[in-house]
Structure formats: C-alpha cells, structure tokens
C-alpha cells in the first residue's frame, strides 16, 4: 500500500463542495487535506458505511454507533421511523451537483458515559448527478452533521465543528481518483492545529481502508458473532461503573490491576449476555472456572448473582478477599479452592509407587462436574486442551479462551499449523486451530468469538451445542489421537507435593 502522504490545502483553498442555500450566507465548507487514491466509488461507499457503523475505528474514546434511522432499511422493510422521536434533527442540506442517496442517523456511544454523553449524528451519502457514460468524473460525498448547535455542547470525542465532509472523485478512464476531507466550522471558527491533526487522521482512516480493499485485503477478524455488540458493551459499562474503581484500589497481586480488572469485566459481560441467550433470566445451572488464577472472574460473576466456583493448582493472595461460602448440591464450599486436576482419562495406575508419602487425595479433582454446569477455561494453559474433553465427559457447555500452548500431558509444545492455509501460521493461531479440532472431535459445535478485551489472546471458543452421534464418541481414542497423557500423572503428584510444602511454610 502506498504511504499516506496527504496534500495539506491552504486556508484559502477553493472549496471542494458547495452547499446550496436560499439565504445570503453560503455555508463555508473548508477543505483541509486531499490524497490521490486507486480505490473506486464502490469501495469508498463500503468503507464509509463501515466507518459510520464502527466509529471506534477512528476514536478509542468510542464504543460503537447505534443506528437509529436508515432510509435504505426503512424503504426495504416498508417502515416509517418518526424523526420527531430523535430530537432536533438537522435539515438535509443540498450540494451543487449532488443528489441524496441515503440518510442515516447514528448515536455515538462513548466508552465512559461518566465523562461524556452519547451524541446523535446525521450521516448523509450523496452521489453526483448526471451520466458518467462518456468517461466523466464520478463524485461521491459523505457528510457528518452532529445534532448540536454550539461548540459547548460538543462532546470530547468529536471535533468541535458543525460538520465533516468526505469527498471522493473518480475517473473511470484513468482508474484513479482522489479523496479529501473538509470541515464546516462554527461561526468565527479558526483552524487550530488540533482540529487539523484530527482531519488528517480521519482522512488517513478512509485512505487506509480504501487502499487495503483495492489491494485485495480481506478482513480476517469478525466480532460480535454470538452476542450483539451493544448488549455486551452496555453490560460491560454497567459492571465497570459498579466495580472497577474498588477492584483496582483494593488490588493485592503484583500484576497490573487495570489490565486484569477491565479484561475480566469484559469477559464477565460477555458471559452474562451469552448465558441470558442460553438460559433466559430465571434459571442458571452454575459454573466452574478451571484454572481460575486470581479468582477475579469468579468473584465478579458471583457478585452479579451467577453462582459458581473456581479452582487452581496454586492459591493467590486475592482469594482471601474474593472467596465466599457457596451453597452447592453437595453442601457448602469455598468459591475458590486449591485443587489439581486429574482427569478420568489419565490412569492412576502406579500412583502409589511414584507418590510415596505426602500425596493428599483431597487436593485432587477428577474433572467430573454436575451435568449442565457451565465450564469456564480462561487462559487456563495446561487445562485448555482438556476443556472440551471434560465438557464431553460431564455433558457441560463451556467457553475456552486459549493463551499458552500445552499438550494433554501438560507440557509446553507448538501445536501443528492449521490445515486451512488461509489462516495465520502463528503459534497462537495454531493453538486455537488445534483445540478447535479437539472440540469438534468431542462432538461439540465449535463457535468462535473474538472478544473485545485488552489482550491479544482474545479468541473464545464456545461449546453449547452437540453435533453428530455423541454416544459413539470414544474419549480414550480422542486423547490418544492428540498425543496421550504420558507424564501427566507425575506432574500432578509433583504439584500436590509442592502444595503440601507451601502449606507447611
């Protein structure tokens, strides 16, 4: 892709677009930057629609946009949305040489509603009038009009201008064109450096995505496939406002509190909305978090009324704060427990010979859970490949978020490259592909979601539906197919003994 090197236009440059008006004062749309491009009008419109629907691409202060009105959708569905319900909606401006093609109204949702409120904005898509059959220029225009009347009303995440215009010009005969950005300033508005930088940034996003499409780029990562984005983000915002500050201020681990708190709040929000789809709001079978680490996710979910517990081979300082007494069908227990997993497929033969003394059976969990218990495996490392296997044994739905690559023996290893050559060949991509295949072999429909969490290890694999003849699945055969368990028992014995030593000290 050619480097982004825009031409900065002079303050007195000739306007790229002219707004028609019946009054004396013509709105002055001032061009700021222009760049040559090789992406056509179809790509330009696709890119602009994507940016309209996903404003977070341009601003990290924004979560998303909720589309409140769309003439194309309304026409297709025969619907009439009363604009009177949307407050003060700007009149549709006319531009010389252009006809209105589509009108959308979006609500910009900020990440922090404590800092700024959502803002409605009209987005207008225009096309040039007349025929281009003789090789004339094709012109397309996209206008953003915030629903505010003064600079003081403008939220922090939006440039303080009355309007933003993106203009695309294309020559079919030369198969090349240009794209530019213009501002409609408030009255008496100047051209401060900050607004100029923002204009360059906005144009760069259009150029980058447009040229990427023209060069054959295809998006690999798709979000919000299992649960709608707005539901997860609304729940996340509510959780953040309820818990984030207190959790960060009371952090006792040596790790970065902000990363862990916000990441687990995101995962909790996703799980809460996923569980709403699976179970409704009146029933929840409980959950178990295998390899629960600091126990924060278990703590948040319990606070929200979703009862469950977690275990890990090593206890954490934070457990003293997060662990609570939990009523279960088998009695009252701690919500966070120090246990080592010894799954049913791992033979216990010879345990007396290798354990000698100091092996405590009560520190071992066999990985069997009550039917229907939702299994959480969040960066569970050694337990990650076991997750779909344990789920199949106990008939439990699950979510698995892989991180570090381990085989079924618990040893570190590099998973084989994906068979699908279109997928990346990285260690993480290989791990995700490998555990996804285990999931499918265990009779689960492997649904995948790219979580919006502050981590590059953000792929979630959800197993909530069975497929094929589940009764014909032989877990032992599957375990052997993926490398077997040689050495796992010895690792468990060492972990249990180290746990004993920790308790003595």
Curated annotation (Swiss-Prot):
Q: What range does the record give for the signal peptide?
A: none
Localization, UniProt? Cytoplasm
Keyword list (alphabetical) reads: Cytoplasm, Methyltransferase, S-adenosyl-L-methionine, Transferase, tRNA processing
**What terms describe the molecular function in GO for this protein?**
tRNA (uridine) methyltransferase activity; tRNA(Ser) (uridine(44)-2'-O-)-methyltransferase activity
GO cellular component terms listed in the entry, alphabetical order: cytoplasm
Record has Transferase as a keyword: yes
A Pfam family (short name) is AdoMet_MTase
| E.C. no | 2.1.1.211
The record's top EC class is: transferase
Q: Name one GO biological process term.
A: tRNA methylation
InterPro entries of this UniProt entry?
tRNA_uracil_MeTrfase
Q: What catalytic activity does the UniProt entry give for this protein? A: uridine(44) in tRNA(Ser) + S-adenosyl-L-methionine = 2'-O-methyluridine(44) in tRNA(Ser) + S-adenosyl-L-homocysteine + H(+)
Major subcellular site: cytoplasm
Q: Which family does it belong to?
A: Belongs to the TRM44 family.
What this protein is reported to do is described as: Probable adenosyl-L-methionine (AdoMet)-dependent tRNA (uracil-O(2)-)-methyltransferase.
| PANTHER family named among the record's database cross-references | TRNA (URACIL-O(2)-)-METHYLTRANSFERASE-RELATED
Q: What is this protein called?
A: tRNA (uracil-O(2)-)-methyltransferase
Q: To which species is this protein native?
A: Neurospora crassa (strain ATCC 24698 / 74-OR23-1A / CBS 708.71 / DSM 1257 / FGSC 987)
Q: List the top taxonomic levels of the source.
A: Eukaryota, Fungi, Dikarya, Ascomycota, Pezizomycotina
User: Source gene?
Assistant: trm44
